[in-house]
Amino acid sequence: MDTLIIVGSMVTLWSEIPMDILRSVFERLSFVDLHRAKIVCSHWYSCSKQSFLRKTRSPLVILFSDDGDCTLYNPEEARVYKSKRDLSRYRFLANSGNWFLVLDPRSNLYIIDLFSEKKINLPPLDSFKGYKYNLKKVGARKFKELVSEYPTSFHHHAKDLRGLLWVDEKKEEYVVVWYFRNKYTMDSLAFCKNGEDHYREMPTHYGLHDISDMVLQRGDHIYLSTSCKYLQKLDLSRQEGIRTKNDDIISRYQLPCRPTNYKLVYDAKCWCSYNIAVTSSGEVLFVLSIFSQSTRRRIFFLYKEDPNPSPSEVIYKNLVEVDSLGDEALLLDLGITVPADSDLGIEPNSIYFTRHDRVANQKRSSPDICVFNIVTKTLKRFPGLSSLKDARWFLPS
């Protein structure tokens, strides 16, 4: 029901407030209050979209503390916001814009909008229908994997679940991908699209079961890298979602050695990590991160497949260094590049980073929220953000 309010000397409905008055009010709102205001009605939503793209599209960080609290950090405002919703019971797996893929204590999957009460219920995990695998729930957090080729079964725990998410708000479409992080089993991915009541199997190539990183691009393709130095591209664009192995793109790459042309203190507590990312044009990037625990110095290097390979490169694809992203920035938590825009606070030639091993989830990894400039080799940290269990950069939609 509309509420009567007084504007000047007139009594009107809040859904009919003139645009110029709304704009003057919206200018004074924080980005969180602006998100709350835009869901009041379609009129307010239209005004917010036309007027304040800057406030709502700057990169934000969602923070997860050790005590279970979930907060938002806006670097431009240098402010931390606490959600009015109780999100402590959820485990966040992935995100696309405002939408987050979450798992509750009963191992139920949902997609939630961080700035509203919208929630999409997803099929249960044990609705998975595979060619070689079936999944049976045997407890609130435990599952039994039945493999047709073996007489025995394997057990999984919800803490080992990994996920990817893509959402198109305009088309009201989404793609959800998940699998259990277990290098000994489950060399297939489970996925579903909007309107489906179960998860289907996306087989990966034999030998790619030890997945080290995954990227979901535009809901059409999944890129996988493995500890065995394989890269695979899976196609989800067909209606049935399954491609034959001959349609998959598989390559084996040669990881670069530690750079020797840049001054960095190497010590026993210094380690390298690798991620993959996909540019807006579809080019795959290999991201090398080097971190020194003694000096807490971190540096990144980008590589891509050699565009002019030697004829002798039959088994391994050589990589060449990338010294610029042009007018793009890399959100490593999502594994994608986005157009840079100083008005939106998205810095060009920059890598937005929190942690390197979302898939592997190694114990030695902890959040290191920073922005690294590829050209100047400078790192910007946010020292006020500490005692965190996890964190994730995202771009509000």
UniProtKB/Swiss-Prot annotation:
It holds the Pfam family Beta-prop_KIB1-4. Residues 11-56 form the F-box domain. It comes from the Eukaryota. PANTHER family: F-BOX FAMILY PROTEIN, OS07G0183000 PROTEIN-RELATED. This is F-box protein At5g25290.
